[in-house]
């Protein structure tokens, strides 16, 4: 009996080794292993190589686990049944004692295997998968060498089955931006990343999805010089709007000639020279980009052209607005470079906000914790969302209810939504419900 118990313990140890090996190899993170391999850890590289082709490894593990389970059942019955039978035979019939001994012996062996050969080693492997994998890789390589004939045989059968059912035989481990975002989110929840670091990484990915109109200065807010503008008017504009660059156009903003740098104008003032644009002022070529460009592509355009300022045009060659390198960096860095600028979203209290109509829809989603706006590809700003939902040029008091919020137009500037009042009306998302002012509302407002 003692020999049988020792055999059972050895089988449990072997099964625990295979269980721990299986879960540790599957749970080991490639990024961490690659860092260790780059530092010269040979075992880390061996684990990576085995992860690339895990078929032989898992075949050996399954052969080992199944063989141990069968042997455990055979030896376990022989180890404990006689002892239980001799104990119970004193108090009951031999037939009943034999049946009860078998049940208890089976339960004891099964419980020992579940606890010590499966649950415990697998939990250890899940807690520290890389550390365990580095320690078991060499013994597993020896097992692979010893069991090579069996591995070839069973792997060949498995490959035939995979080909018959046209199943993929290699795992795809391409890392996507969603995978990185999930890791970052987990790091933020665990407290590893600070709030600013988390937001910065989120903003990096937004550069790929947000187009230039979401961060531009719209055309109605662009300060530009007419080629034939008088000198006093130019001085007044520079004094009132101290920008570093000014567009130069011919009669209207859609006929761009170039731009002038404020430093050039300052040098002419210091030299007592005229500021008139047709009197020798250097007019530089303007970088022009389409409105379909993403912010990351705009950064690349700035780098290629050696500029920090660009005009955005649509498909009809009409100026949509302008964007600067600072606009892109403000989107990327958020409050770190945006301090001192006029806030587009102002919280009145915990349940209401005043939002500028030109605020990018992504910023509104972040502040209000809204997952997605309907058909957001059709607009870039919260004002565009209102026009899209109302299906008309909005007027004051027009409103839309969405995602538990009421979006109400409170100010219009030349047909453009200048400000919205957003009020939380419900903690749960609600269906889209545009509301237009009717006769009854007008009567009540007059009263």
From Swiss-Prot:
Gene inactivation effect: Deletion of the gene results in increased sensitivity to cadaverine and putrescine, but not to spermidine and spermine.
Keyword Nucleotidyltransferase (UniProt): no
UniProtKB keywords: CBS domain, Cell inner membrane, Cell membrane, Membrane, Repeat, Transmembrane, Transmembrane helix, Transport
Signal peptide limits: none
Periplasmic side: 26-54, 121-141
Membrane topology category: Multi-pass membrane protein
A molecular-function term among this protein's GO annotations: flavin adenine dinucleotide binding
Residue span(s) of domain CNNM transmembrane: 1-197
Record-linked InterPro entries: CBS_dom, CBS_dom_sf, CNNM, FAD-bd_PCMH-like_sf, FAD-bd_PCMH_sub2, Ion_transp-like_CBS, Transptr-assoc_dom
Gene Ontology terms: cellular component: plasma membrane
Main location, first listed in the record: membrane
CDD domains for this protein: CBS_pair_CorC_HlyC_assoc
Transmembrane segments: 5-25, 55-75, 100-120, 142-162
Cytoplasmic side stretches: 1-4, 76-99, 163-447
Domain CBS: 216-275, 282-343
Subcellular location: Cell inner membrane
Domain of life: Bacteria
Keyword Transferase: no
Protein task: Involved in cadaverine and putrescine tolerance in stationary phase. May facilitate the efflux of both cadaverine and putrescine from the cytoplasm, reducing potentially toxic levels under certain stress conditions.
PANTHER family documented for this protein: HEMOLYSIN-RELATED, POLYAMINE EXPORT PROTEIN
Family affiliation: Belongs to the UPF0053 family. PaeA subfamily.
Protein name: Polyamine export protein
Lineage: Bacteria, Pseudomonadati, Pseudomonadota, Gammaproteobacteria, Enterobacterales
């Amino acid at each position: 009996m003692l020999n049988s118990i020792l055999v059972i313990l050895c089988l449990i140890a072997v099964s625990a080794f295979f269980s721990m090996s299986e879960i540790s190899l599957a749970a080991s993170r490639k990024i961490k292993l690659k860092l260790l391999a780059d530092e010269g850890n040979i075992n880390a590289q061996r684990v990576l190589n085995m992860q690339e082709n895990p078929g032989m490894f898992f075949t050996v593990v399954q052969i080992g686990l199944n063989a141990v389970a069968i042997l455990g059942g055979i030896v376990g019955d022989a180890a404990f049944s006689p002892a239980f039978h001799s104990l119970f035979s004193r108090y009951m019939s031999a037939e009943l004692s034999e049946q009860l001994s078998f049940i208890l012996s089976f339960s004891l062996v099964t419980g020992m295997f579940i606890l010590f050969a499966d649950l415990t080693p697998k939990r250890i492997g899940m807690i520290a998968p890389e550390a365990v994998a580095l320690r078991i890789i060499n013994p597993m390589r020896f097992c692979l060498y010893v069991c090579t004939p069996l591995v070839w045989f069973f792997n060949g059968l498995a490959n035939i089955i995979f080909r018959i059912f046209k199943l993929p035989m290699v795992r795809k481990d391409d890392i996507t931006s969603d995978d990185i975002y999930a890791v970052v989110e987990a790091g933020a929840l665990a407290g590893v990343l600070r709030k600013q670091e988390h937001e910065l990484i989120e903003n990096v990915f937004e550069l790929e999805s947000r187009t230039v109109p979401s961060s531009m200065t719209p055309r109605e807010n662009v300060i530009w010089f007419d080629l034939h503008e008088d000198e006093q008017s130019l001085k007044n504009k520079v004094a009132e709007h101290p920008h570093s660059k000014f567009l130069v156009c011919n009669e209207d903003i859609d006929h761009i000639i170039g731009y002038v740098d404020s430093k050039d104008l300052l040098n002419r003032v210091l030299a007592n020279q005229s500021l008139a644009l047709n009197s020798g002022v250097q007019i530089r070529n303007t970088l022009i980009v389409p409105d379909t460009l993403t912010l990351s592509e705009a950064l690349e355009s700035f780098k290629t052209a050696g500029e920090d300022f660009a005009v955005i045009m649509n498909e009809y060659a009409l100026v949509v607005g302008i964007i600067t390198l600072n606009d892109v960096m403000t989107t990327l860095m958020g409050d770190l470079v945006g301090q001192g600028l006029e806030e587009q979203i102002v919280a009145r209290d915990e349940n209401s906000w005043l939002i500028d109509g030109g605020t990018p829809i992504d910023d509104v989603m972040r502040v209000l914790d809204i997952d997605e706006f309907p058909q957001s590809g059709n607009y870039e700003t919260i004002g565009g969302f209102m026009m899209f939902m109302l299906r008309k040029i909005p007027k004051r008091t027009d409103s839309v209810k969405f995602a538990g919020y009421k979006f109400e137009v409170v100010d219009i500037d030349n047909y453009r939504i200048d400000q919205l009042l957003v009020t939380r009306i419900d903690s749960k998302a609600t269906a889209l419900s545009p509301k237009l002012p009717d006769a009854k509302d007008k009567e009540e407002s007059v009263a």
